[in-house]
Amino acid sequence: MPKIKTSRVKYPEGWELIEPTLRDLEAKMREAENDPHDGKRKCEALWPIFRISHQKSRYIYDLYYRRKEISKELYEFCLDQGHADKNLIAKWKKPGYERLCCLRCIQTRDHNFATTCVCRVPKHLREEKVIECVHCGCRGCASGD
């Protein structure tokens, strides 16, 4: 007899420890997606979504690499299920990108003169005091800040 495939996902050991936090962040994400954006610029409507996505990825990254509280199996499960952005986490592992806010800020095709975003400039080199990234609303994610 052929095996019957079920749609039920087997969660790895330790999932019950991180599930409440991920559920809270998912609820915040749904709320941010459904939030009306009256009076905001087109790009400002996406800023809360980018922040929550960054927060979820940073939570899983910190649990695995910094605090070492979750197993590799659980970490890879979270990446495969889309609970964290694996490309952003891959950049966080590289020197100079430890505090990167989003991947759009380092893509040169989205910026004038093929450079990176203004939030990647260290604070002591900026001419203006308060500046926000157009893509995600970040105020500064350079490693030297």
Curated annotation (Swiss-Prot):
Family: Belongs to the BUD31 (G10) family.
Protein name in UniProt: Protein BUD31 homolog 2
Keyword Nucleus: yes
Domain of life: Eukaryota
Keywords per UniProt: Nucleus
InterPro entries in UniProt: BUD31, BUD31/G10-rel_CS
Predominant place of localization: nucleus
Keyword Plastid (UniProt): no
One GO term of the biological process aspect: mRNA splicing, via spliceosome
Annotated Pfam families: BUD31 (PF01125)
